[in-house]
A protein has these predicted regions:
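Juxtamembrane/disordered regions of integral membrane proteins
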Residues: 1-126
Length: 126
């Protein structure tokens, strides 16, 4: 029973983080649309995907910490690792420059999960 409760918490946090992720991707496409036939190679076109990955992981991990306040680091890292696995798989499916892939994988997932745990313990947790 405890396992199912924790699994449902992880799924809820992943779902919320994914919604935030997609909102940032959509905003990036609305604010910085690429002209027709233009290759998205300018750095500005990679800003919002990076922000989407970072804030999606951050928000999902904060929600996970709120749902499971006794083991915040462990469960925040679970969310960060799952999002990292998605980021690694996206690297093989979506063409992007090496600088973006490396910055995304190194800065957007595990550090954001740890930052979420820090924010939760310092600012949100009563």
């Amino acid at each position: 029973m405890k396992f199912l409760l924790n699994l449902s918490r992880v799924i809820a946090a992943l779902f919320a983080g994914s919604i935030i992720n997609m909102c940032f991707v959509w905003l990036g496409q609305q604010w910085f649309p690429a002209p027709a036939g233009f290759k998205n190679a300018l750095p500005i076109h990679f800003l919002f995907p990076f922000l989407a990955h970072a804030f999606g992981t951050l928000s999902g991990a904060i929600l996970m910490c709120w749902l499971k306040p006794k083991e915040t680091r462990r469960y925040a890292l679970i969310i960060g690792i799952i999002f990292l696995m998605g980021g690694i798989s996206a690297c093989f499916m979506i063409p992007a420059p090496a600088w973006f892939i490396s910055a995304d994988l190194v800065l957007a997932y595990i550090p954001m999960a740890l930052l979420a745990e820090y924010f939760f313990n310092k600012l949100i947790k009563p």
